[in-house]
């Protein structure tokens, strides 16, 4: 990727929005758990200053650190990934969705993925003779 393209990606309004939203959620969860910035930064192996950058939603913060922080605080990460799912399909992400709880949406997505893949796996793993036995027994 060219440096110009990388710079354009880091200046993306969507990416900046996600980092800002993520930073707020990380800070809220950390405070709710009664963990100081110093403690949390030490736990995940970064400096307190870098954690401040993440929590403030600084555009220069790395998204992978947002994911590490969210996972460490046991936050679900749909709010990070769903906006990019929309973008990947050339759709604008409705920011109103970020005000709600993603739990149900995340579970429905997981359920859909599991159902589709279980069905396909079942077809692949079902021996041909099982269908022949059913036909012969009928």
Question: Where in the sequence are the language-model features?
Answer:
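A short, Lys/Arg-rich alpha-helix, primarily the initiator
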Residues: 2-32
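Short, charged recognition helix plus adjacent turn
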Residues: 7-8, 81-121, 129
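Short basic helix-loop element that most often maps to the first helix and adjoining turn
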Residues: 24-43, 67-68, 95-104
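Key DNA-contact positions within bacterial/archaeal DNA-binding proteins
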Residues: 38, 49, 78
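Recognition helix of helix-turn-helix/homeodomain-like DNA-binding domains
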Residues: 44-61
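DNA major-groove recognition helix of helix-turn-helix/homeodomain DNA-binding modules
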Residues: 45, 64-80
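Short, solvent-exposed alpha-helical "recognition" segments
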Residues: 58-63, 89-91
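Short, charged, intrinsically disordered terminal tails
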Residues: 120-138
């Amino acid at each position: 990727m060219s440096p110009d393209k990388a710079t354009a990606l880091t200046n993306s309004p969507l990416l900046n929005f996600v980092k800002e939203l993520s930073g707020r959620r990380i800070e809220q969860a950390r405070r709710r758990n009664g963990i100081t910035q110093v403690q949390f930064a030490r736990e995940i192996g970064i400096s307190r200053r870098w954690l401040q950058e993440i929590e403030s939603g600084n555009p220069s913060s790395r998204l992978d650190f947002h994911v590490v922080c969210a996972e460490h605080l046991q936050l679900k990460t749909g709010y990070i990934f769903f906006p990019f799912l929309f973008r990947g399909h050339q759709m604008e992400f409705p920011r109103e969705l970020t005000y709600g709880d993603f739990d149900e949406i995340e579970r429905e997505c997981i359920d859909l993925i599991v159902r589709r893949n279980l069905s396909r796996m079942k077809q692949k793993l079902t021996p041909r003779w099982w269908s022949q036995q059913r036909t012969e027994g009928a």
